[in-house]
Curated annotation (Swiss-Prot):
PANTHER family: AGGLUTININ-LIKE PROTEIN 6, ALPHA-AGGLUTININ. Each ALS protein has a similar three-domain structure, including a N-ter domain of 433-436 amino acids that is 55-90 percent identical across the family and which mediates adherence to various materials; a central domain of variable numbers of tandemly repeated copies of a 36 amino acid motif; and a C-ter domain that is relatively variable in length and sequence across the family. The lineage of its organism: Eukaryota, Fungi, Dikarya, Ascomycota, Saccharomycotina. SMART domains: Candida_ALS_N. This is Agglutinin-like protein 5. It is found in: Cell membrane; Secreted, Cell wall. It comes from Candida albicans (strain SC5314 / ATCC MYA-2876). Residues 940-950, 1003-1021, 1066-1088 have a biased composition (Polar residues). Changing V326N: Impairs amyloid formation and decreases cell aggregation. Forms homodimers through the tandem repeats. Aggregates in amyloid-like structures, with self-propagating secondary-structure changes, amyloid-characteristic dye binding, and induced birefringence.
Length: 1347
């Protein structure tokens, strides 16, 4: 019986044991004790003592429960015992076993089991000390290679795990003091195997190894080598404790025995080091000796032979221990109705047990009975202290009734609904609903109907398929309004009838007209079936006949019958010989009307006429972005007239007019008709062709208009009038630069003399007239316009010439048919030229005026290109080249206006002459390069962006205008001349380089940018001269000359910035004393002044590693102004206060970056009335507004506000009155570092024009201000001022350097000539402050992602 009880107890104990977590709650300390005379505190050297806090609560932990502490990167426990007890007050509450990871796992663990001393009334807590050694590598095994990356020299975080609870502490590990370039050795004892792992790494060869031999062996035979546990490889570097971090295979030969192991290797690449490790078993682990073979040859070096011997000794183990306190809970019965808890007095320094007393009421026992009902009743039988009270509980129970219903679920459910007011409960049973049914009707090939039912599983859908035979079909044919046939099939449901409707177009109709014998007309229509032809027969009575008698030139008579169609009139023409010799001929055309009459005269008249008409029309298909039609018309006429042989009169005119309106479409159809009519006979020729052009546009237009007319009339006894009209057309088409197609036709005029027979009218009579007036007029007018546009197009053309010839004694008509086609490609170009000349009629005007204007424009754009090199190194290159050339030339010659004055000849009244030359050249080249490389396996990314932008522009403008007027004794003399010249030359070059490297393993982020911008702007020779000479009645002479030359030679900005480590400590800058020199020379009351000033801002040496950045600015500006006036005055001073905000703007490519500093200024000015002839000199300039963000300066207080924003500039104009008094101050309250005081140097200077410069560099602000005081009144014929300014700013910071020294230099030279001396003072200030490195880092990273 006792044995059975014992077995049952053991079974219940093991059955209820469980795994618990959260027992270890902290790492209280982690300290190192030198157990083997080690040279440094390395993580792998014993012993590291970890003190951990623990707590066991008997209410949640039971005997037999287990818990585990995992210790990553721990190599072994260095204790002599195999386990440690968790003890409190001398009582063991749990036992923990040591499991060292060694070469087996990357972690060690502590597995604990709760023993029987822990009861539910006990809560024990305490600490345990664990002696350990960490694993930071030491062999080529996978476990050691992984743990070789656990820690680095310096501060590390050690983390242990108890279930989901992590215990961490910070600890400092020292780096190995052994030189990594020499040979490296390590030995570690593995208690579980009772063996030692020995490592040997060959000395370092930076360029690699040509060959070598390495190994180790026992010196006295007391060490056995395990050849089954050997690792050989090459490692790419070692960690901070000289252990391999990688292992790769290479070429070697191995020799191994129980006495020694060695390898011979060849050709090890640079950056790798060979190593060998093996397990050894010394006879005494605390003391043994090994001999090492060390022969090697580095690349490009000599053979090295350096064997050595090492004696190894062991270390002293540390013991694990535990201590803690016990909390005991006791229970006492009281008469209270509730339970109370109290703690007895406890002194932690003396007592080892903490007692908690639980006060409980009298215990009770409960008896439960049941009955059919609704409510529960309670009754209590009391008892004194020491006995047990009884509580009787009468619990009701209910009977049930079952209800079954259907639901949408897939299973059957049973739910009991308790009735709170009755003793009968309801049991609801829900069964799934039956599946829904879907009926589908289909056609099939059988002639009968079939039904099939398909039943699916629960929650599915059952299907009923009804199969019906196909419906019969009825076909109907109909006529419809379309020109094509179509068939429509109407399918009905089963048991219906399908319909096929065939729609046919209406039959064509043929109409036939016939004569018949009746006197009335009738129409008969014959209609056929579809696809036939309907007939309409019209029957007409015969036509009436009209007989006409005419004269003709033959000597015999003839009869001609002309029969026409129905409803017409037939004609009978009788031709009789001519009896009179007079005629009239009328010829009409759409272009001209020529009539002539003549009779015998002593004059011989030659008359020729040729009429050529050309008309063209085009119909173009519509498109979404082009006009829908095109029309072109060309008319040309030429006429010449000769009055008689003895008169000096001739007239010749030629007029050509072109109008064009076309659409840009893919098809153009042209139809052109030519006709020719000559008075010698009746001949008509019709030529028709069509062309199709698939193009964007292609046109060539030439318009020529010339007119030469001379006329002179003299008295003659007999008069005659002859008009000759000649029409000539020349059509020239230039389709493209590749295809030139010229089509020309020339129709010579026929010559008619008096000996020819002319047609005359019966009533025609000769006409004669005479004239006695004489007039002479010469008019010459010429206008030439040429326009050529050849965009890219494809040209297709086809032509046809139709001929149908029929002949009769009086007419000949012919049509000729031909066709051709061709296509070509048209290249783009554009040119425009215009010229005109004018000569006015004698005797009112002489000489001539010619005007010439030409304009050309060419443009070329290079297509972008893109290239890719590899998957991990992509190179994208974008290139764009745009060349634009535009030139305008104008030539104008002199025109002389004359008027006749009493017959004395021509008097010159005006000789205006003007010349305008303008030339503009623009050359823009844009090159952008983007290089991206990435290596996803190592989580390193590198991005480089090297855009390059070069832009240059040259423009020149010259204008000259003069007017001269010369008159006789009455007209006054006025002379005006004006000359202005403007030229400018702009050049801008920009180069930006951005690089970024990110390494996710080490957490390093490097971002940098380099920007170079060079600008050259030159604006010179702005000169304007005006002179006015009045007549003799006025004596005032006014002249003014101004010559302003401004030249900005070059501006170069180079910025390079690399961001590495944040530095929030401010630096203090000192200012070197300023120096200036003045040179005064006096020559004929002319005083010259030269001022040179240099201000240098230096920084004190810094030793912290901050940001690598540099900024250099070079700017040279020169301006010269010369002003001549009759009188000049300045303004004296009066008190006033103003506030000035200085802004400096730098632009690159298509964006502008602005920075601004706020300067407080005080000024005073007083107005003095100027003489009536004085002129106020005003300076107009543009400002740009900027808004931005204010960045706080960590570590210093500075009221300087820096603003930056990429925004388009807004132009505004302000007017500055000459000679205000300006005093500028700059406040800087930056706090200085210890022993580095700040210095500020102030300089004040007053010159003719106020000037202020604000240079904002990368993290530095340098401000120089100038002030001006009023000048005395100056009366001078001229004032010349020349100002040259050069700014060089360079700011460099280098993480490897120990200091940085920015320098700012401003030089200014002013020269003035005046009658009275100037009042000159000097004032200025300069200061600088350094922004913390975090701001530079933020800006650089933001700039990188922005670009």
């Amino acid at each position: 019986m006792i044995q059975q009880f014992t077995l049952l107890f053991l079974y219940l104990s093991f059955a209820t044991a469980k795994a618990i977590t959260g027992i270890f709650n902290s790492i209280d300390s982690l300290t190192w004790s030198n157990a083997g005379n080690y040279a440094f505190k390395g993580p792998g050297y014993p012993t590291w003592n970890a003190v951990l806090g623990w707590s066991l609560d008997g209410t949640s932990a039971n005997p037999g429960d287990t818990f585990i502490l995992n210790m990553p990167c721990v190599f072994k426990f260095t204790a002599s015992q195999k386990s440690v007890d968790l003890t409190a007050d001398g009582v063991k509450y749990a036992t923990c076993q040591f499991y060292s990871g060694e070469e087996f796992t990357t972690f060690s663990s502590l597995k604990c089991t709760v023993n029987n001393n822990l009861r539910s009334s006990i809560k024990a807590l305490g600490t345990v000390t664990l002696p350990i050694a960490f694993n930071v590598g030491g062999t080529g095994s996978s476990v050691d290679l992984e743990d070789s990356k656990c820690f680095t020299a310096g501060t590390n975080t050690v983390t242990f795990n108890d279930g989901s609870k992590k215990l961490s502490i910070a600890v400092n590990f020292e780096k190995s003091t052994v030189d990594q370039s020499g040979y490296l050795t390590t030995s570690r004892f593995m208690p579980s195997l009772n063996k030692i792992a020995t490592l040997y790494v060959a000395p370092q060869c930076e360029n690699g190894y040509t060959s070598g031999t390495m190994g180790f062996s026992t010196s006295y035979g007391d060490v056995a080598i395990d050849c089954s546990n050997v690792h050989i490889g090459i490692s790419k570097g070692v960690n901070d404790w000289n252990h391999p971090v990688t292992s790769e295979s290479f070429s070697y030969t191995k020799s191994c025995s129980s006495f020694g192991i060695s390898i011979t290797y060849q050709n090890v690449p640079a950056g790798y080091r060979p190593f060998i490790d093996a397990y050894i078993s010394p006879s005494d682990n605390n003391q043994y000796q090994l001999s090492y073979k060390n022969d090697y040859t580095c690349v490009d070096d000599y053979w090295q032979h350096a064997p050595f011997t090492l004696k190894w000794t062991g270390y002293k183990n540390s013991d694990a221990g535990s201590n803690g306190i016990v909390i005991v809970a006791t229970t006492r019965t009281v008469t209270d109705s509730t339970t109370a808890v109290t703690t007895l007095p406890f002194n932690p320094s003396v007592d080892k047990t903490k007692t908690i007393e639980i006060l409980q009421p009298i215990p009770t026992t409960t008896i439960t009975t049941s009955y059919v009902g609704v409510t529960t009743s309670y009754s209590t039988k009391t008892a004194p202290i020491g006995e047990t009270a009884t509580v009787i509980v009468d619990v009701p129970y209910h009977t049930t009734t079952t209800v079954t219903s259907e639901w949408t679920g897939t299973i059957t459910t049973t739910t009991t609904r308790t009735n709170p007011t009755d003793s009968i409960d309801t049991v609801v049973v829900q069964v799934p609903l039956p599946n829904p049914t879907t009926t589908t009707t289909q056609f099939w090939s059988e002639s009968f109907t079939s039904t099939t039912t398909i039943t699916n599983s629960l929650k599915g859908t059952d299907s009923v398929i009804v199969r019906e035979p196909h419906n019969p079909t009825v076909t109907t044919t109909e006529f419809w309004s379309e020109s094509y046939a179509t068939t429509e099939t109407i399918t009905n449901g089963p048991e219906g009838t399908d319909s096929v409707i065939v729609r046919e177009p209406h039959n064509p109709t043929v109409t036939t007209t016939e004569f018949w014998s009746e006197s009335y007309a009738t129409t008969e229509t014959v209609t056929n079936k579809p696809e036939g032809t309907d007939s309409v027969i019209i029957k007409e009575p015969h036509n009436p006949t009209v007989t006409t008698t005419e004269f003709w030139s033959e000597s015999y008579a003839t009869t001609e019958t002309i029969t026409t169609g129905p409803l017409g009139t037939d004609s009978i023409v009788i031709h009789d010989p001519l009896e009179e010799s007079s005629s009239t001929t009328a010829i009409e055309s759409s272009d001209s009307n020529i009539s002539s009459s003549a009779q015998e005269s002593s004059s011989s008249v030659e008359q020729s006429s040729s009429i050529v008409g050309l008309s063209s029309s085009s119909d173009i298909p519509l498109s979404s972005d082009m006009p829908s039609s095109s029309s072109t018309g060309l008319t040309s006429s030429e006429s010449s007239t000769v009055s008689s042989y003895d008169s000096d009169s001739s007239s010749s005119s030629e007029l050509s007019t072109f109008s064009s309106s076309e659409s840009y479409s893919s098809s153009i159809s042209d139809t052109t008709n030519f006709w020719d009519s000559s008075s010698s006979d009746l001949e008509s020729t019709s030529i028709t062709w069509s062309s199709s052009i698939d193009a964007q546009s292609s046109q060539s237009v030439q318009s020529v208009s010339n007119s030469i007319s001379t006329s002179q009339e003299t008295t003659s006894s007999s008069g005659e009038e002859s008009n000759t009209s000649v029409t000539d057309i020349l059509v020239s088409s230039d389709a493209s630069s590749i295809l030139n197609s010229d089509i020309s036709s020339y129709y010579p005029s026929s010559t008619i003399s008096l000996s020819d027979d002319f047609p005359h009218t019966i009533a025609g009579e000769p006409d004669s007239r005479s004239s006695s007036s004489i007039a002479s007029t010469v008019e010459i007018s010429s206008d030439l316009v040429s326009l050529t546009s050849d965009p890219t197009s494809s040209f297709d053309s086809s032509s046809s010439l139709n001929s149908d010839s029929s002949s009769s004694p009086f007419s000949d008509e012919s049509d000729i048919s031909a066709s051709s086609s061709f296509s070509t490609l048209v290249a783009p170009s554009f040119s425009l030229s215009s010229s005109s000349s004018l000569s006015l009629t004698y005797p009112h005007y002489v000489n001539s005026t010619t005007y010439h204007a030409s304009e050309s424009e060419s443009s070329s754009v290079a297509s972008p290109s893109m290239a890719s090199e590899s998957a991990n190194d992509d190179t994208h290159t974008l290139s764009e080249s745009t060349d634009t050339t535009s030139s305008i030339g104008t030539d104008s010659s002199t025109v002389t206006f004359c008027r006749r004055d009493n017959g004395d000849g021509c008097i010159v009244t005006g000789m205006p002459s003007s010349s305008i030359d303008s030339e503009q050249t623009s050359d823009v080249t844009t090159t952008s390069s983007f290089v991206a490389s990435s290596t996803p396996t190592s989580a390193e990314q590198s991005i480089t962006d090297n855009p390059n932008i070069d832009s240059s522009q040259t423009s020149a403008s010259s204008s000259t205008k003069s007017s001269v007027s010369v008159s006789d004794t009455v007209v006054n003399s006025i002379s005006l001349s004006e000359t202005s010249t403007l030229s400018s030359d702009d050049s801008t070059s920009s180069d930006t380089s951005i690089s970024s490297t990110t390494n996710s393993d080490t957490g390093n982020i490097n971002a940098g940018s380099s920007h170079t911008s060079t600008a050259s702007i030159k604006e010179s020779s702005i000169q304007k001269t005006g002179v006015m000479l009045s007549s003799s009645y006025l004596s005032t002479k006014l002249s003014s000359t101004s010559d302003i030359t401004t030249e900005l030679i070059t501006t170069e900005l180079i910025t390079t910035e690399l961001t590495t480590i944040e530095d929030n400590e401010p630096n203090t800058f000192t200012s070197t004393p300023s120096s200036h020199s003045e040179i005064f020379s006096s020559d004929n009351s002319v005083l010259s002044k030269q001022v040179d000033r240099e201000s240098t801002i230096k920084t004190s040496p810094t030793t912290d590693v901050t940001t690598v950045s540099s900024l250099s600015v070079h700017s040279t500006e020169a301006s010269t102004a010369t002003l001549g006036e009759n009188s000049f005055s300045n303004v004296a001073s009066t008190p006033s206060n103003i506030a000035t905000s200085l802004r400096s703007t730098s632009s690159s490519s298509n964006h502008a970056t602005e920075s601004s500093g706020t300067v407080k200024s005080e000024a005073s000015a007083e107005a003095i009335p100027s003489p009536p002839t004085s002129t106020d000199n005003r300076l107009s300039y543009s400002t740009e507004e900027a808004k931005g963000i204010t960045y706080a300066n960590s570590g210093s207080t500075n009221n300087l506000i820096t603003e930056s924003q990429v925004a388009a500039p807004t132009d505004s104009t302000s007017v500055l009155i000459e000679n205000p008094v300006v005093t500028s101050t700059f406040d800087d309250n930056s706090s200085a570092a210890v022993d580095q005081p700040s210095k500020t140097k102030s300089i004040e200077e007053s010159i003719m024009n106020p000037d202020s410069t604000n240079e904002t560099n990368n993290g530095f602000i340098a401000t120089l201000s100038q002030a001006q005081v009023p000048n005395s009144l100056i009366h001078s014929e001229s004032i010349s001022t020349t100002m040259a300014k050069t700014t060089d700013a360079s700011i460099n910071g280098d993480s490897a350097a120990s200091n940085s020294q920015p320098t700012t230099l401003i030089q200014q030279v002013a020269t003035s000539s005046y009658n009275q001396p100037l009042i000159t003072t000097y004032a200025g200030s300069s200061s600088a402050t350094k922004h913390p490195s975090w701001l530079l880092k933020f800006i650089s990273v933001a700039l990188f992602f922005f670009l």
